[in-house]
Amino acid sequence: IQAKAIPAMISGIDLIGQAQTGTGKTAAFGIPILEKVDPKLKKLQAIVLCPTRELAIQVADEIRNLSRYMHGIKVLPIYGGQDIVKQIRSLKSGTQIVIGTPGRVMDHMRRKTMKLDFVHTVVLDEADEMLNMGFREDIEFVLSGVPEERQTVLFSATMPKPIMEITKKFQNNAKVIKVTKKELTVPNIEQYYYDVKPKKKEEVLSRLLDIYSPRLSVVFCNTKKQVDLLVNALLGRGYFAAGLHGDMKQEQRDRVMQGFRTGKTEILVATDVAARGIDVDEVEAVFNYDLPQDDEYYVH
């Protein structure tokens, strides 16, 4: 996706990138954004919309990393559940690139705490996921509020009708780039499945954890309730487990992720949506406690 998207984005045209998670698309839009941003201009110049807080934080970290030898570039992740006054202060202090969830970006636009006059690039990352989560109106509000003379770039794993409607309304002759599923990046992963009665799942998971002793593992569940139930069950069995889902406050989520990254928590139990964008190197095992409702979730 990078080889195809970077030249197209740098040329300034509107773009639709159909690519799954794990294809390196953050750099595909991050590098062109950094090429186009003027470090001397201490005004907002690019906005990236992401479906979740975790993904916004991760994308911001990656773009910061890409810009570490460029002086004067400020990247700010903004999302709900975080102190808005701090965000306003950071926006006033010359942030050029905002990575945010649609709701919070819209909130700043309504409060007039985000000045959009110099915005030349808007990226929708995981656009289908944002629509699934009910962000369509927020996205349309944001796109309607930025200058018309801009580049609009959209990345999505799937292309349902609502995405095509947004494309038609807000993009001009967008170039379509596809990275097909055959090229999906999951090398060197061994997969196994066990046919287990629901009430035996907890016992089987515990046995597998004992046999293989993965350093860090992620367990995916389909519901928040199941996450809470399983975390309590694992803690009761003496495992170092913690849960992650959308009902948790941002501080709690940050604390859980910090514990997992440092290895204090060995088992992260999460819903698919909350876990989107999690990037931890040392994960040795992934358990799909429930079968994901979407094959894209299964791969990511």
Over which residues does each language-model region extend?
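Conserved helicase RecA-like core
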Residues: 1-300
